[in-house]
Curated annotation (Swiss-Prot):
SUPFAM superfamilies: NAD(P)-linked oxidoreductase. One of its GO terms (cellular component) is cytosol. It comes from the Bacteria. InterPro entries: AKR_Detox_Biosynth, NADP_OxRdtase_dom, NADP_OxRdtase_dom_sf. Signal peptide: none annotated. Disulfide bonds: none annotated. It comes from Pseudescherichia vulneris (Escherichia vulneris). This is Uncharacterized 11.2 kDa protein in crtE 3'region.
Length: 103
């Protein structure tokens, strides 16, 4: 897939970004690893995640997506250097409020 410049950051990403909100929610760790392997094999290099992903699922606290991504990176030396990882912090979905303020 052709990569595009991300503004003036020097980063190059495909026009599609993979959503990591499914990790630890609708797909388990093993399925997540398979999806991430396929993503990298096909030349995609951008993944979106957030600390609140899957916090809405019973038994989850949030952070499941990052935990699975961290385990996958640990099991795949060199993969982290190939991936552009987008994340967000500061929201509390249960309280339905923003915890951090922007300036």
């Amino acid at each position: 897939m052709a990569l595009r410049s991300l503004g003036t950051t020097g980063l190059h990403i495909p026009p599609l970004v993979f959503g990591g909100n499914v990790f630890g929610w609708t797909v388990d760790e093993q399925q997540s690893f398979s999806l991430l392997d396929a993503l990298l094999e096909r030349g995609l290099n951008a993944i979106d995640t957030a600390d609140v992903y899957s916090a809405w699922a019973p038994g989850n606290k949030g952070g499941e997506s990052e935990t699975i991504l961290g385990k996958w990176f640990a099991a795949h030396p060199g993969a982290r250097e190939k991936i552009t990882l987008f994340t967000k912090v500061g929201s509390d979905l249960k309280a339905q409020r923003l915890m951090l303020r922007t300036m």
